[in-house]
């Protein structure tokens, strides 16, 4: 992405992002968020954060080398956001060549959970039940 241009006379022109449209509809975004959150809850994920409904996805990728993929090494990841009903953060955890396990679900997801447990305190995001009660006027 081009962010600036420097002309021969050293004058600089900066370019900001341009919104060209919506990638998916609001309804589709809500459906996808529900699917991601439900999948995490149903698999007793290490990414869960008590009191918060989180949406996210694990990833595990082989590492390419000159003669093919490296043996027994991966890039493990987890990307998640929340709270699902009013997202305030998105976090990506990426681990190159994790040693305890090659899987994102066993390495990056628990790291995400530990990070987000601290993040919700730092950002002063109340648990879902408290936020929803406040929104309902109670």
Label every model-predicted segment.
Residues 1-19, 36-124:
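Active-site beta-strand/loop architecture of penicillin-binding DD-peptidases
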Residues 32:
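Serine endopeptidase catalytic core focused on the charge-relay Asp
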Residues 126-138:
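Short, highly charged C-terminal tails/helix-capping segments
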